[in-house]
Each structure stands twice: as structure tokens, then as C-alpha cells.
């Protein structure tokens, strides 16, 4: 799967751009503020319905316009597919796939799986468990068609349970919701656990290439003691949950633990090593997607030269090429990427003040 055409209209400082990317490595270069990262952001927005740089989607709309429009043609094994997205400053979003209106943004994610390696994406290890849960759930969503419905139900029931706790409801009033919570939690947890087990098999080899001297152990924690029955735990923790006004334990507390010996990876590894570990996780996730459902991710790699030294840039780019996936990588100077590749980029784009030029 690859993008063979991308139209960007009124996205940040890009007034209008049309790209015909290669299915291999696409190098986008230009000075800071030129708009090169905005191209990656537009692709991500088209696949996720949101930005990886700002939580306020209205901010990505060009200041002089009331809406942005993104359009892409995807090359798929079954033939070409067309995706269109329009976001209005009012917050309304319109999405079409092959001319049909789409109501759920999850359909976009299913159609256009995207992996991001940016300065922001390194928060996967540097911040709390939320981003690591999102990492697991991205894979679980793509690997098992039952995951999304179960995950939506977990969120729905958890919201209802927390509202009852804030209302000081008796446990008898909460019991029905607990039965539902347990049922959907078991589904979500089983799929998450199975996914992390599969990821681990691929991850060992990739981590070995990036960090050959380091033994990293990866494990999934479900959000409560695995030796404890979840239904019994909810009942026994009811007084504590009532006091805090929210559910203390459960799938919303799940995490991906990475350890080196007895220490968390965050404490045992240097910042540079942690960045390589995040790269390994993203590449393993993309490779597993291909293995499980025979679909490539699209990799968006932003500002690589500032994040990794020349040796590790070369290693990461080799791994990306080996995936066989489509890659978009940005840099200020093209030589920083070209010199790290064994063969020239399949296509190069220069961006200046929001204008995109193909370099032949």
C-alpha cells in the first residue's frame, strides 16, 4: 500500500500543493518553517483525523481560510482507492472514501495505517503510560477486528461507572455496570496481551540491531494484578473508588513495560538509546502489521538528522528500506539523508514558504 497522489489545500502555510510520491523513500527538505513537516502532518491528519503536533485541529487550517481539504489516491492490492477529508474551522469534519461518506474516523485509521517517528513521538518512553497504551491499541485495533467495539464499550462503561461513583451510588447500583465492565475488559485485555506477545517476537531482532549490547525486556501490564480476579477486585476496591470518585484499577491503567535488568529502560538507557528503542518499536509494529494482515504502514519520519547521529541514521534508514513500506522523511539539508542511504531516495521534494517543488 502506498500514496500515489496527495493534494493539500489550506493546511498550515501550504496554500495548495500536489505531490506524486514514490512507493519507496521520499525525501522532503527545506529550511525550518518552510512547511516540510506540514506535509507529514497532512498525511497523518488524513489517516487519523487529527494532528500529531497540536490537540486543536482548527490550528492547522490556514489563517486566511475557513476550511482545509486533503485528498489522496492510495495504491492497494485490490486497486486504487481515494480518500478525501475536509475540516471546517467550526470543528465539523467531512470524510469520504471512494465517494462514500464515512462517519467514523476509525475507518480512516483502518484504511491508512501510519507510523510516526518525530521529536514528539519519543514521548512514548519519556512520559506516562497513556502514549504506550495508545501504541498497544493501535496494533490491537489493526490486528483484531473485534478490538475496536470492545474498546469503545470499555470506555462507555467506565464513564458510566465513574459517574455513579461521583454520585455516591451504592455498590448494588454499580453491580450491573461492573458485570459489563468485566466482560469487555476481558476482551480488550486478551487482544492487547496477544498483540504484545506477537510484537515481542519481532522486536527482539530489531532491538538487537539497534542496541546490540543491551538486553531489553518488554512486557504488558493489564492495569491490575494479574493474579487477582477483576470482578472481585472491583467489588473489594469499591470503597476506595468511591472515595476517589473514579475507578482506580482496570484496562485504562494498562501499560507497556520496558526494562533493562532490574531497571526501567527510561532509567537504564541514555536519551540517544531510548530514541533508538522507540524507532525499534515503531518498525516492529509496522512489520507485524504486514505479517498479520498483509498491509504496509506508511512511515513519517521528521527531522531525523537532529535526532540521531550519522551511524544510527544509516541504521534506521536501512531498517525502513527493508520493511518495503513507503517512507516520507524530512531534513533541512538533503545530504544528511542522501549520505545515509545506500541508494538515492526514490523521490525528492523541496519546500520553501509552503511551495513544494519536485527535484528531478
Curated annotation (Swiss-Prot):
Broad class of where this protein is predominantly found: cytoplasm
InterPro entries with a match to the protein in the record: DNA-binding_RecF (IPR001238), DNA-binding_RecF_CS (IPR018078), P-loop_NTPase (IPR027417), RecF/RecN/SMC_N (IPR003395), RecF_2 (IPR042174)
Pfam families (UniProt xref): SMC_N
Chain residues that bind ATP: 30-37
Subcellular localization, as worded in the UniProt entry: Cytoplasm
Record GO biological process: DNA replication; DNA synthesis involved in DNA repair; double-strand break repair; SOS response
Keywords for this protein: ATP-binding, Cytoplasm, DNA damage, DNA repair, DNA replication, DNA-binding, Nucleotide-binding, SOS response
One Gene Ontology CC term in the entry: cytoplasm
Gene Ontology molecular functions: ATP binding; single-stranded DNA binding
Family: Belongs to the RecF family.
HAMAP family: RecF
Name of protein: DNA replication and repair protein RecF
Organism (species): Shewanella sp. (strain MR-7)
Gene: recF
Amino acid at each position: 500500500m502506498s500514496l500515489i497522489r496527495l493534494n493539500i489545500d489550506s493546511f498550515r502555510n501550504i496554500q495548495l500543493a500536489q505531490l506524486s510520491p514514490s512507493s519507496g523513500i521520499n525525501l522532503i527538505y527545506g529550511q525550518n518553517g518552510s512547511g516540510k513537516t506540514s506535509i507529514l502532518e497532512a498525511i497523518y491528519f488524513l489517516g487519523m483525523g487529527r494532528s500529531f503536533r497540536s490537540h486543536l485541529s482548527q490550528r492547522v487550517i490556514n489563517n486566511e481560510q475557513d476550511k482545509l481539504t486533503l485528498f489522496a489516491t492510495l495504491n492497494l492490492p485490490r486497486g486504487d482507492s481515494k480518500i478525501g477529508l475536509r475540516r471546517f474551522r467550526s470543528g465539523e469534519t467531512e470524510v469520504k472514501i471512494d465517494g462514500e461518506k464515512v462517519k467514523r474516523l476509525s475507518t480512516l485509521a483502518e484504511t491508512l495505517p501510519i507510523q510516526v517517528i518525530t521529536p514528539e513521538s519519543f514521548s512514548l518512553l519519556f512520559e506516562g503510560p497513556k502514549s504506550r497504551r495508545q501504541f498497544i491499541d493501535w496494533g490491537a485495533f489493526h490486528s483484531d477486528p473485534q478490538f475496536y467495539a470492545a474498546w469503545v464499550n470499555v470506555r462507555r462503561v467506565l464513564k458510566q461507572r465513574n459517574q455513579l461513583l461521583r454520585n455516591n451510588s451504592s455498590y448494588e447500583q454499580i453491580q450491573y455496570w461492573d458485570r459489563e465492565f468485566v466482560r469487555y475488559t476481558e476482551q480488550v485485555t486478551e487482544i492487547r496481551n496477544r498483540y504484545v506477545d506477537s510484537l515481542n517476537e519481532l522486536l527482539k531482532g530489531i532491538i538487537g540491531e539497534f542496541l546490540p549490547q543491551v538486553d531489553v525486556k518488554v512486557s504488558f501490564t493489564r492495569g491490575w494484578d494479574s493474579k487477582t480476579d477483576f470482578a472481585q477486585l472491583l467489588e473489594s476496591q469499591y470503597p476506595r473508588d468511591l472515595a476517589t470518585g473514579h475507578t482506580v484499577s482496570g484496562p485504562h491503567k494498562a501499560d507497556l513495560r520496558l526494562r533493562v535488568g532490574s531497571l526501567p529502560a527510561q532509567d537504564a538507557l541514555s536519551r540517544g538509546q531510548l530514541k533508538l528503542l522507540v524507532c525499534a518499536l515503531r518498525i516492529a509494529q509496522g512489520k507485524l502489521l504486514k505479517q498479520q494482515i498483509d498491509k504496509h504502514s506508511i512511515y513519517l519520519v521528521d527531522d531525523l538528522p537532529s535526532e540521531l547521529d550519522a551511524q544510527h541514521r544509516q541504521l534506521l534508514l536501512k531498517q525502513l528500506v527493508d520493511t518495503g513500506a513507503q517512507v516520507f522523511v524530512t531534513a533541512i539539508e538533503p545530504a544528511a539523508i542522501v549520505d545515509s542511504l545506500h541508494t538515492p531516495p526514490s523521490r525528492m521534494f523541496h519546500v520553501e514558504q509552503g511551495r513544494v517543488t519536485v527535484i528531478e
